[in-house]
Amino acid sequence: MGKIIGIDLGTTNSCVAVMDGDSAKVIENSEGTRTTPSIIAFSDGEVLVGQPAKRQAVTNPKNTLYAIKRLIGRRFDEKEVQKDINLVPYNIVKSDNGDAWVEIDGKKMAPPEISARILQKMKKTVEDYLGETITEAVITVPAYFNDSQRQATKDAGRIAGLEVKRIINEPTAAALAYGIDRGAKDAKIAVYDLGGGTFDISIIETIDLDEEGQQFEVLATNGDTFLGGEDFDRRIIDYLVNEFKKEQGIDLTSDSLALQRLKEAAEKAKIELSSSQQTDINLPYITADASGPKHMNLKLTRAKLESLVADLIERSLEPCRIAMKDAGLSNSDITDVILVGGQTRMPKVQEAVKNFFGKEPRKDVNPDEAVAMGAAIQGGVLGGQVKDVLLLDVTPLSLGIETLGGVMTKLIEKNTTIPTKASQIFSTAEDNQSAVTIHILQGERQQASANKSLGRFDLSDIPPAPRGMPQIEVSFDIDANGILNVSAKDKQTGKEQSIIIKASSGLSDEEVARMVKDAEAHAEEDRKFQERIETKNSAESMINGVEKAISELGDEVTSDEKEKTEAAIKALREVMKGEDSDAIKEKTNALMEAASSIMQKAYAKMTEKQQSDDGAGTQNADHKEDDVVDADFEEVKSDKKD
């Protein structure tokens, strides 16, 4: 059985890990870094992923996609999506089914399709490291992701050519990595996870089961799927735009090139202010008007940054209060506080967490890597490499159906341990009602319309009867990934109807299949591209070697040999201008044949020279041997005292 890798599919950065013996190991990507920017760019027919995409973002803002995780599994009309439309340089559009998609060069693409590109890079990173094909993964999601977002993440995995063995909550994964690393011990851990685009808080209990191993049980979880480092960056960008407008009278908000440079500068300034009190923001030629080019030169202090984002930090504390209340714990019950996500490196965030929980957060957990490591450990559990670990996660939001009067009736309460099942008997609202519509909801509001609609289906052919008489059993079944299956059964007739919730905003099987084919086609394109490069490099090396041999041999090369070889080189250089690998290989072989006599002469000359050098070296060694003088020696002791 192959290894099951662990992937932290982040809003800003992604990370991949795999079990290496008894521990999880984060794998470096092809650029040599342990995290990969979750950025995809489309440039001149080429798809760039990670650092290469980030590097060209300033010059190609409309075709560079970042923070796509904030759109995954979301409807176009959601207020969070509408807010993002005005903040990003790329086009967010409404798909035929009402989803939020993106548009690049007139082509609409689904967020899972974009995220799949990042997952493919993570997959290839491990494949290059292990030297084997990877087909299975555990992928993490924010604990507060709803059913649609989880399903869309699973779709992204399928498109990337991965069987997603488990969807695991990010804070749970971090606690798993932390708990396994420090050994079995009873503890109650608060995981504060403030990433690039989402925020989660989970309260997790670890229990030492002696010979049976270690149990990780999530007691409560809460969060905000539209709060993260991107929002902190946006506050800095808005501040810079306003300051520049005051100074120069120019509004930069409609200049996508300037905004991309501001985004880059804001992120850099934010990082610098975690370790220094002040930073300079210098952006020459940020724009121009009739009077000439304009430059931005501003100082940003840590205090100013803290004032700009104070409400965002405060916003993260309300879910903490709710989670603690749901877990039935007080601050004194918490053993350890773990910080996860790059934004937790900000000193003001650390201070807020410390003040809230009344204890210093632990600094021995890498906030960028813990989630991927936990996912790899869960992969190890599922693959049988990691023994004696029991993980009990929860559903983050309540699940139920719409009943008479537009009310949501809950069947499964939030923070229920999964997998789980629940059933309830309902009846008809009118006399002789022959069908009922089961409308499935997720959320905490009493009013059905205020919650997230996950889907609906009909149970028909109910025998005529007075209202309230038929007995319809509705059953909810949540699997270990937090994905829901709902069924409704008429107790009298035994007729049953069921639905696996793929969410009204999910992709159809046909769409996923098409995207899988597209991804495979791109993988084949990438392979051919790599093959072309290697073939061209090999041809170039061959040309260099032959030209060097001709130069070194001089008059030893006959005019006929030289003429034949130069003609072969010219023919090879001509085909190297194209993209036909087979033609390049053919002309490379032709050059090898044409230059064979020259290369034989060059080899013979080199062998002769080596033998000559070896002979001279032996002679010198003999002379040195004659010069050796035998001598006695005695140790001279110093009178110096230490």
UniProtKB/Swiss-Prot annotation:
Region feature Disordered, mapped onto this chain: 602-642
Designated name of the protein: Chaperone protein DnaK
Phosphothreonine PTM sites in chain numbering: 198
Domain of life: Bacteria
ATP-binding found in the keyword field: yes
Gene giving rise to this polypeptide: dnaK
Inducing factors: By stress conditions e.g. heat shock.
Family statement: Belongs to the heat shock protein 70 family.
GO molecular function terms noted in the UniProt entry: ATP binding; ATP-dependent protein folding chaperone; unfolded protein binding
Keywords, comma-separated and alphabetical: ATP-binding, Chaperone, Nucleotide-binding, Phosphoprotein, Stress response
SUPFAM superfamilies named in the record: Actin-like ATPase domain, Heat shock protein 70kD (HSP70), C-terminal subdomain, Heat shock protein 70kD (HSP70), peptide-binding domain
Pfam families: HSP70
Function: Acts as a chaperone.
